[in-house]
Amino acid sequence: MQGEFETECPGYCGAQDTFYIGTLKGVGRVYQQTFIDTYAKVGFAKLYDRKTPITAADLLNDRVLPFYEEHGMVLQRILTDRGTEYCGNPEHHEYELYLAVENIDHSRTKAKSPQTNGIVERYHKTMLNEFYRIAFRKKIYATISELQKDLDVWMTEYNEARPHQGRYCFGKTPMQTFLDAHTIAQEKQIGEQFTAQLEA
């Protein structure tokens, strides 16, 4: 499938991207930072009024890394496009610095080749069709936090109640896929730590 790549277990690689939601009357521009685990398809999304390296790092710090820590795992690498919110001088760029501090490898999509991050593109399309189009028909949002509350409800349902046909999901929910592969991920991480100690 186009946009798919090899991933070994939950936490092995996540994909992150920015999704421009639009301009809301009385609110202004709304951007979504999106993260999806490329193995289990567990997703996270947080809304902002701008797209910057700080907002990109905030999603990881506020939602993504605490989730992995809660399950005794680490995020090993992340795939992004080459947008300015993700790429810059590693010594001064807040997102690049955050990844370095958290020891997360950073892979970038090929230039002018967004389909290499196709997993997150498909996720955005699903969100647009199943959440945003419906939400904006039903309600006028006065604040980003109001929209975030409804998005969080949808995200919980997506992760915990909706069967997924992803490569490793086999019709299970993303969260069930994540939990089922949890032991594999922990064994892989322990094995990599042991190998690193032997090589040191």
PLM regions: where:
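C-terminal domain-tail junction helix/linker
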Residues: M1-E6, P10-G11, E102-I104, T126-A200
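Mobile-element integrase/transposase regions
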Residues: M1-I36, V42, D58, Q197-A200
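Residues immediately flanking
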Residues: T18, T38, R50, R82, ...
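Buried hydrophobic side chains on well-structured beta-strands
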Residues: K41, I78-T80
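Active-site beta-loop-alpha junctions of metal-dependent nucleic acid enzymes
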Residues: K46-M73
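Hydrophobic beta-strand scaffold residues
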Residues: L75, D105-H106
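RNase H-like two-metal-ion nuclease catalytic core shared by retroviral integrases
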Residues: T80-R82, Y86, H92-L99, H106-E130, ...
